[in-house]
Amino acid sequence: AENGCSAALILMSGLDSGVLATAERLARDRGLTVLGAITKPIDILTLEKLLELVPLIDRHQEVSNSGSMVDKSDFSVQELTQAVSQGQIKPWFQPRINLADMAFVGVEALARWQHPVKGMIPPDRFIPLAEESGLIDELTVSMVEQSLAEVARWQTENLTLDVSINYSALSLADLGLPDYLAGLVAARDLKADRVTVEVTESSVLTEIQNSLDVLTRLRMKGFQLSIDDFGTGFSSMQQLQNIPFTELKIDQSFVKRALSDKDAKAIVETTVDLGRRLVMSVIAEGVEDLETLELLKNYQCNQVQGYFIAKPMPGNQILEWATMWPSVASGYTG
């Protein structure tokens, strides 16, 4: 990292997978590109899958260098402010599937910034800047209003879906959020129980007192509450009992390694079991192949999302995708 290495890395070790997972996390935290980590003896098929990603990584780096994808240092707070006010940042939607019957049941709204000059800017490039500059509330309001408008439009076309919307720690400090969101849902003729507020473990910890208040009020108004990236933060089991969450989302870092890493597999299985015992729905994100889908189905995970199902897409593509999905899903059932 100190020498500015841009090569894609594959970590291998004969040590236990816990040590390897820590090394992988440290490498990523230092800005290194890590395709994956595998334990010895090496599984050839796993290694081949990782090596197949190299051309994609190289292509991404070429695109980054050409300026189509940009770092947050490449644009200003003024540009971001203008983007929010002009509607350049829009929600894209990633479908979520119910594993019991493979039905299309919901979407997660994800922010995408279509810059008029610099092209598509991913959320990890501008969300931190929005938080640092105080724009996150304005951005969140825009995302929520656009997302609910799309959900309402789909509903008029006889497609009723749940929608999950991400909220930051700063937004959770706003005691007016529950009333605002309830009014917005009512104005769109939507039901509160079809709207899920997603928060990360770290978000809850950042503003613990206000977060508990706001989350409790949201739940009392009928909204679903999801703890995102479960297993990657530092929350205790006590918090799961104290906060009225209705859903757990297993972080994709565990899901993607479930087939090759026994510890990740155990975490996935245990999380599904924990959610079931706490009467919470469990969602697995980052499903990228049929084998992982089948594993999660065997564990009785409730819902999944990931590139194997569909990549995030603009709202105007959802109706067409919904029409196409049943024929695709029929190949995975039976």
Please provide the spans of the model-predicted regions.
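CheY-like receiver
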Residues: 44-52, 56-84, 330-334
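Alpha4 helix (beta4-alpha4-beta5 surface) of REC/receiver domains from two-component response regulators
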Residues: 2-8, 15-36
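EAL-family c-di-GMP phosphodiesterase catalytic domain
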Residues: 14-15, 33-51, 60, 169-173, ...
